[in-house]
Design a protein with these regions (language model features):
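Rossmann-fold dinucleotide-binding core
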Residues: 115-194, 198, 229, 240, ...
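NAD(P)+-binding Rossmann beta1-loop-alpha1 motif at the extreme N-terminus of oxidoreductases
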Residues: 1-53, 57, 109
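Rossmann-like NAD(P)-binding element
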Residues: 39-42, 53-116, 122-124
Length: 380
């Protein structure tokens, strides 16, 4: 296995400069590349601010902060940026044609042994890999925002990714003090979005079908299901643009994995993107982030079985389709969604039989989308 020292990060936005920072903190030599010097100047400023803040808080010494900063070199020229790279982490916007264009350029200038890792939350890995001359050296890597704070990284091999590249990527994730979960098959949404995105839509259907209010559903999700915040609150925190994009990508890949609720598209079109725009499902004031008033009293008014059924059916689907196993799904849900209690533990408390019955009832009223996964049926 190669001794990894030199990393190039393509794209210096929020995710890109965050990944550059965590890599430099772990001791790697990092080249940060973008198409304009102005973008790089801004990114380097943000990295400096972030490191100085850590030093002020006493998390690292000022000397360490300066050393980390000095390990990141901003470069505009692509050929120069990848000249000594062993691993290239690409963090350009999630637009398939743009990614393919970047890889065509990259494939032409990078050394033949260089590994390419695409930071993506939903785009098909194999499809991008097949556009280059080295699909066996291509892998998906999904950091969560902000990379400096979020512990979880999904690692997604394409159909042709070599075992050596999978091992090396997982080693890299461990070296930057993150926890990796391996999504063994390149399925729509990978693990986290396969659980989270359909659940947002399901919460909208739940309002329509049960008459429960937003704060009742959110309170039940927080207090009964052990989420760190309500599902609508989490959607506002994530951003409707992100959810809308993930919905489209997942739906394009497989119409059976998601049943889009029209509300998401309407909110996206109306630019109600959540916290970042001041309004999503809830309204936010500019001055500071206010928590939505959720309570155990409100939670008692709502039975969240429809939502549990949805997320569990999707978790079971991941196992049945050999993309993951229960242990990895629980790890992903804990680190990526902040779940305080394992999903399948909650399911057993509610009763798998009750969940399967709920899915059967939903399927009889609303169609095949709700048919229970064979794994859940076998567990009851």
């Amino acid at each position: 296995m190669i001794n990894l020292k030199n990393i190039t990060v393509l794209g210096s936005g929020i995710m890109g400069h965050g990944i550059a920072q965590v890599s430099a903190t772990a001791g790697y030599n990092v080249i940060l590349r973008d198409i304009e010097q102005g973008f790089l100047d801004k990114a380097m400023e943000k990295i400096k601010w972030s490191l100085d803040k850590l030093a002020t808080k006493g998390k690292i010494s000022q000397q360490e902060a300066d050393a980390i900063y000095s390990r990141i070199t901003p470069i505009v020229n692509l050929a120069e940026a990848v000249k000594n790279a062993q691993l290239v982490i690409e963090v350009v916007p999630e637009i398939m044609e743009l990614k393919k264009k970047v890889y065509a350029e990259l494939d032409a200038v990078a050394g033949k042994d260089v590994i390419f890792a695409s930071n993506t939350s939903t785009l098909p890995i194999t499809e991008i890999a097949n556009t280059i001359s080295r699909p066996e050296k291509f892998i998906g890597i999904h950091f969560f925002n902000p990379p400096q704070l979020m512990k979880l990284v999904e690692v997604i091999p394409g159909e042709k990714t070599s075992q050596e590249v999978i091992d090396l990527t997982q080693e890299y994730v461990k070296s930057v003090k993150k926890e990796s979960v391996l999504c063994r098959r390149d399925v729509p949404g990978f693990i986290i979005n396969r659980l989270f995105i359909p659940m947002v839509h399901e919460a909208c259907y739940m309002m329509d079908r049960t008459g429960a209010t937003m704060t009742e559903i959110d309170s039940a999700v927080k207090f009964k299901l052990g989420f760190p915040m309500g599902i609508f609150e989490l959607a506002d925190f994530t951003g409707m643009d992100v959810i809308h994009k993930a919905t489209i990508e997942m739906y394009l890949r497989d119409k059976k994995v998601i049943s889009p609720h029209p509300t998401i598209e309407k909110m996206f079109d109306a630019k109600k993107l959540g916290q970042k725009s001041g309004e999503g499902f809830y309204k936010y004031s500019d001055e500071k982030y206010e928590r939505v008033p959720l309570s155990e009293e409100l939670a008692d008014k709502c039975n969240p079985i429809q939502l549990v059924a949805n997320i569990l059916n999707n978790a079971a689907w991941l196992v049945t389709n050999k993309a993951s196993d229960i242990e990895e799904i629980e790890k992903a849900a804990q680190l990526g969604l902040g779940l305080k209690k394992p999903l399948f533990e909650t399911a057993k408390e509610i009763g798998i039989k009750n969940i399967v019955n709920e899915l059967k009832q939903l399927a009889s009223k609303h169609g095949k989308f709700y048919e229970p996964d064979p794994l859940l049926v076998s567990m009851q």
